[in-house]
Design a protein with these regions (language model features):
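Short glycine/serine/threonine-rich phosphate/pyrophosphate-binding segments
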Residues: 1, 94-100, 162, 166-169
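Alpha-helical segments flanking ligand/cofactor-binding loops in enzyme cores
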Residues: 3, 25-26, 106, 168
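Active-site-proximal region of nucleotide-activated glycan assembly enzymes
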Residues: 6-70, 78
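Short loop/helix-cap segments at secondary-structure boundaries that form the rim of catalytic
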Residues: 26-29, 41-50, 126-134, 151, ...
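Donor-nucleotide binding loops and adjacent catalytic segments primarily
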Residues: 67-74, 78-157
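A donor-sugar binding/catalytic signature common to diverse glycosyltransferases
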Residues: 148-174
Length: 174
């Protein structure tokens, strides 16, 4: 689409979310009038005169949320008096995170902390089947979290895949 738009004289821009430019964006950069980047030093991949440092897009709900920690923890059915660890692998999930939790269920169950595990849609059925009849009370399992502002607010610690969007959100929320 960008190639066609450029041929038609329509101004185009691309957005590179990562600190290392992908092959596609490096190729598309030739057609783009501007290249929005999240990090300094992107001149090694793109012409400096085309670069605009915009940062990565983040969910507006993270900025506008007013939920308090106790309310956020309770929204997951957990105890506000206990520490909470949020484990997220993105919307598709992260097999290594899910497998680690499943391999250490005894540690999870005997822990003084509580856990929210976002499995991702792909792994959810497998995880819930594995947990049938043996899910620890301090472990909440969900395929997807629609209110990430509440999830982040509830968490004392986040264990996550290192995606560009996730890292940008962590920088925003602290």
């Amino acid at each position: 689409m960008l190639n066609q738009a450029a041929k038609m004289g329509i101004p185009c821009l691309i957005q590179e979310q990562n600190s290392y430019a992908g092959v596609t964006n490096k190729l598309l950069a030739k057609k783009a009038e501007r290249i929005c980047v999240a990090y300094d030093g992107m001149e090694k991949f793109f012409p400096a005169e085309k670069i605009i440092k915009t940062g990565n897009p983040v969910r507006q709900s993270l900025l506008s949320s007013t939920i308090e920690k106790d309310e956020a923890v309770k929204s997951f059915g957990l105890d506000p008096e206990k520490k909470t660890i949020l484990l997220v692998g993105g919307s598709l999930g992260a097999r290594t995170i899910n497998d680690s939790v499943m391999q250490h269920l005894d540690l999870v169950e005997n822990s003084d902390v509580q856990f929210v595990l976002q499995t991702g849609k792909y792994y959810h059925a497998q995880i819930t089947d594995t947990l049938k009849g043996r899910q620890p009370k301090n472990l909440v399992v969900t395929d997807f979290i629609s209110d990430m502002a509440a999830a982040y607010k509830a968490a004392d610690l986040v264990i996550s895949r290192a995606g560009a969007s996730s890292i940008s959100e962590f920088c925003l929320i602290g």
